[in-house]
């Protein structure tokens, strides 16, 4: 009670007293603090019952006023006094002792405001960065500490200052041996009062405001980036700023944890190599990321509806305020799922912002400790429910990832790092890759669809290894083709408008009677270049109208139904194909792909051809399109159309060129569809009223007809509809790609 009255009286006296010069006023307030420790005998009274908070606030106001009255960069006498008399060192000692109780909180507030409100750079001064470093060590020591809020504010202002001047981070990398020796700055007596009694007020060695931090060899701190990078590799270092933030990420107070995560985000982005190495080699940052991912993943229910995993929203690591009571669409495990995906989002953003050295190390840690150690066994299990949930979670991760380094490690986890052509005996090299590809052909349609969607989203990611590993490495030598040297009479055939060696599909019995609605219009054909004698098949650019019409007339007329429904024509696919092709071209822009196929004379055509496990499964699935569920067919054709969009000449030739000379035993997408059509023509003859039933099913699928009695051969009819639409889509893709390549 009496201390509060004395505090009020003291403030009144200060307000009425004549103003002193700033330096005298500053020294007065500092001496008032030191005299408290000399004169008081009650060190258990809380600091809020003393004048110390008021004096500290006055000192800060004086420093700010002094800076405002001087030219930019000029150090005034009050700041000189603070630096030379080691005021911050003394305050650190008082804060560490927490004498009187609550002093640590006041010291943290003073440091935070000093660094935040003073514009001139303070951290280069030895008598600033050294006590700041010591105070950092006190932060995060105890979770749920009453000073947690002040601790995180202080740490974040230090991080912000380092973000402004990244080279300063070298002051905060301590040699472990030296850091242990330099612990506290308390005199042998051990009390805070003892240190103050030994402070004679005489200035020690002067450190100018613009002192070169690189010359402070006597401070025991690491020199700035001028120090050799090699030394950083041999000296074990402490990064206490990171360690304190890591401790505070575990705070039960969500706001504190988020602020700590923000501080780490600032630190990982610093461009200093030594800091990046220390971050990953001498701190537990990588372990924290993966351990929390693991614990959150293991907290998920064993079974979650894949649709819930796909559609859950509100995933943002900094906004985690989910309330079950307010969520009308809550499902079992939603809280745990959001927590897991939010932390993955944080890992992704952290790696995205990080220095490349730190990013690479953190991404590898996520792969080794979480993906391989935790997720892989879940993906390889035999329980269908477990496989479905694990695949859906992996699919969500693939969709969500944005950082280049983490994406690369996820790709290596799923596909492996091999780039040699595949063989049938390669299964043991990458068991997870093989198992996931097998799951595309799983007995469970749900697992097949989910795994196909995983690969579809994987193909849309900006990573060259994905497509090369799955497809391109097997097409590199073009040994799916059979080279036939042109005969002398080929020139005459070309001049007559035909292509040597090509099958004239328009004269094939399968393709006779093509209706006008299925042919390419004259406007679209106008983009095709004129046929020239130099235009051979082997250049991969067979005339676009022949290619397009080849796909459009694949399905016989009696198996077509789109022309009887408005708005389902071929032209509807052109717009989508054009948009998607531009997107894929943007993805592949930096991959340095060739503009033309590899010359036949440079290809090893004698090597045995294997299309690869991925294309094998897709082609096998495509071959069963008439006997598979509608949803499976949609997903299979979706993946194949995405593959066809890639602007690589070998992919275009293998998937979109009907006229390619296939080597014996090889198949292309077109040849697979031809076999399906042949089977379809036989089966049509056995189904009475096939065309009316087909039209009815199409209208039901489009919602133009209400559901009624079950139609016989429903799976076959739905498969025919998907087949027709897929052929139109491939025709549109072929046209768009050719038009793009022929446009100057």
UniProtKB/Swiss-Prot annotation:
**Compositionally biased spans, kind Polar residues:** 215-229
**Region Disordered: start-end pairs:** 197-229
What transmembrane ranges does the database entry give? none
What the entry lists under Pfam families is as follows: DUF5917 (PF19314), KELAA (PF19311), RAI16-like (PF10257)
The similarity annotation says: Belongs to the FHIP family.
Q: What does this protein do?
A: May be required for proper functioning of the nervous system.
What is the official name of this protein in its record?
FHF complex subunit HOOK interacting protein 2A
Q: Which gene encodes it?
A: fhip2a
């Amino acid at each position: 009670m009496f201390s509060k009255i004395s505090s009020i009286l003291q403030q009144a006296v200060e307000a009425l007293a004549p103003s002193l010069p700033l330096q005298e006023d500053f020294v007065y307030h500092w001496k008032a603090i030191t005299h408290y420790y000399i004169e008081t005998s009650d060190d258990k009274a809380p600091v809020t019952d003393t004048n110390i908070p008021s004096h500290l606030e006055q000192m800060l106001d004086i420093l700010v006023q002094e800076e405002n009255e001087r030219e930019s960069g000029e150090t005034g006498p009050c700041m000189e006094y603070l630096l030379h008399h080691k005021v911050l060192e003394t305050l650190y000692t008082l804060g560490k002792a927490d004498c009187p109780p609550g002093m640590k909180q006041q010291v943290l507030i003073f440091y935070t405001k000093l660094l935040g409100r003073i514009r001139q750079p303070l951290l280069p001064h030895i008598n600033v960065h050294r006590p700041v470093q010591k105070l950092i060590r006190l932060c995060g020591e105890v979770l749920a500490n009453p000073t947690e809020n002040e601790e995180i504010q202080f740490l974040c202002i230090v991080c912000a200052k380092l973000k402004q001047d990244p080279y300063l981070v070298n002051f905060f990398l301590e040699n472990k041996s030296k850091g242990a020796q330099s612990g506290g700055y308390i005199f042998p007596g051990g009390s805070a009062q003892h240190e103050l009694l030994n402070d004679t007020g005489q200035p020690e060695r002067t450190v100018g405001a613009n002192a070169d931090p690189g010359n402070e060899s006597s401070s025991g701190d690491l020199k700035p980036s001028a120090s050799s990078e090699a030394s950083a590799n041999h000296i074990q270092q402490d990064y206490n700023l990171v360690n304190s933030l890591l401790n505070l990420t575990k705070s039960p107070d969500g706001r504190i944890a988020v602020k700590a995560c923000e501080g780490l985000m600032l630190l990982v982005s610093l461009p200093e190599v030594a800091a990046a190495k220390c971050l990953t080699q001498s701190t537990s940052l990588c372990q924290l990321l993966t351990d929390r991912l693991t614990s959150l993943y293991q907290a998920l229910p064993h079974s979650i509806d894949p649709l819930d995993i796909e559609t859950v929203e509100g995933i943002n690591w900094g906004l985690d305020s989910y309330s079950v009571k307010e969520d009308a669409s809550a499902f079992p495990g939603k809280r745990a799922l959001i927590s897991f995906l939010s932390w993955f989002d944080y890992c992704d953003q952290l790696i995205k912002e990080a220095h490349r050295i730190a990013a690479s190390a953190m991404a590898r840690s996520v792969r080794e400790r979480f993906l391989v150690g935790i997720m892989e066994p879940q993906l390889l299990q035999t329980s269908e429910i477990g496989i479905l949930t694990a695949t859906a979670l992996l699919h969500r991760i693939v969709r969500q990832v944005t950082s280049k380094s983490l994406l690369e490690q996820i790709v290596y986890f799923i596909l492996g790092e091999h780039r040699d052509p595949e063989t049938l005996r390669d299964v043991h090299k990458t068991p997870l890759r093989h198992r996931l590809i097998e799951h595309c052909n799983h007995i469970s349609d749900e697992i097949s669809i989910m795994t196909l969607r995983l690969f579809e989203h994987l193909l849309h990611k900006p990573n060259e290894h994905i497509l090369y590993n799955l497809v391109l490495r097997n097409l590199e030598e073009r040994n799916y083709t059979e080279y036939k040297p042109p005969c002398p009479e080929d020139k005459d055939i070309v001049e007559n408008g035909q292509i040597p060696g090509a099958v004239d599909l328009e004269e094939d019995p399968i393709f006779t009677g093509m209706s006008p609605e299925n042919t390419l219009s004259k406007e679209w054909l106008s983009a095709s270049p004129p046929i020239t004698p130099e235009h051979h098949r082997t250049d991969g650019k067979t005339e676009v109208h022949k290619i397009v019409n080849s796909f459009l007339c694949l399905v016989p007329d009696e198996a077509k139904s789109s022309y009887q429904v408005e708005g389902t024509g071929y032209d509807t696919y052109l717009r989508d194909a054009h948009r998607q092709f531009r997107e894929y071209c943007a993805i592949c822009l930096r991959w340095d792909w060739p503009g033309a196929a590899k010359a036949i004379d440079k290809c090893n055509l004698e090597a045995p051809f294997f299309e690869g496990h991925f294309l094998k499964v897709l082609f096998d699935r495509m071959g069963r399109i008439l006997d598979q569920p509608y949803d499976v067919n949609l997903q299979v054709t979706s993946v194949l159309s995405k593959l066809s969009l890639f602007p690589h000449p070998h992919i275009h030739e293998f998937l979109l060129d009907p006229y390619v000379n296939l080597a014996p035993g090889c198949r292309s997408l077109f040849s697979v569809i031809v076999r399906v059509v042949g089977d379809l023509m036989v089966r049509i003859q056995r189904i009475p009223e096939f065309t009316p039933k087909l039209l009815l099913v199409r209208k039901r699928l489009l919602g133009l007809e209400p559901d009624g009695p079950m139609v016989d051969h429903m799976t076959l009819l739905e498969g025919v509809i998907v087949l027709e639409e897929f052929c139109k889509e491939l025709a549109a893709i072929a046209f768009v790609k050719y038009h793009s390549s022929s446009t100057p």
